[in-house]
Amino acid sequence: MFEDSSDFHDYYRTRQGRHVAMRLRRTVGDFWSRAPNACNVAIGYPPPVLRTEERPPVLSFTPMRLGLRPWPPKGPNRSALVNGRSLPLQNVQLDRLLLVHALEFDPSPSRLLDECWRVLDGAGRLLVMVPNRNGLWARAEKTPF
């Protein structure tokens, strides 16, 4: 079981982890809003699936229980530790919200989803990436799936 952001970081540095991240980045790439004033946020452990060159920039929020790893590795930090039950955002503020490695590790996933709906704009979109608990990778101890 992955306990903190260091576990995720170490996994995504492996050959298998880099391959998974590349495939997830392709999926997520078209999801982000490209509008000049768009507000895009990712929650969980999103750095492996984010591109530093996204415009407008994406913010990375990590739940407090995982601990924070600064992101991106170069340039101004765009990551923060957050409480999933009280996101530091205004109501109906976000254009896009990505959850990756968030729901499966949250002790109260329904409360996290409620908070997501609170901060999403009426036309906003939510993309939730969760592992298949019946899949082969879910049975492996060395993956976050």
Language-model-detected regions and their locations in the chain:
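A short acidic, Gly/Pro-enriched loop at the edge of an enzyme's catalytic core
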Residues: 85-97
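Short glycine-enriched, charge-decorated loop/helix-capping segments at active-site entrances
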Residues: 14, 75, 142-145
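Short conserved AdoMet
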Residues: 33, 107, 121
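Class I SAM-dependent methyltransferase SAM/SAH-binding core
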Residues: 26, 30-87
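Conserved class I S-adenosyl-L-methionine
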Residues: 125-145
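A short glycine-rich, Lys/Arg-flanked "PGG" loop and its adjoining helix->strand segment in the class I
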Residues: 110-125
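Class I SAM-dependent methyltransferase Rossmann-like catalytic core
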Residues: 1-34
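A short SAM/SAH-binding and catalytic strip from SAM-dependent methyltransferases
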Residues: 95-110
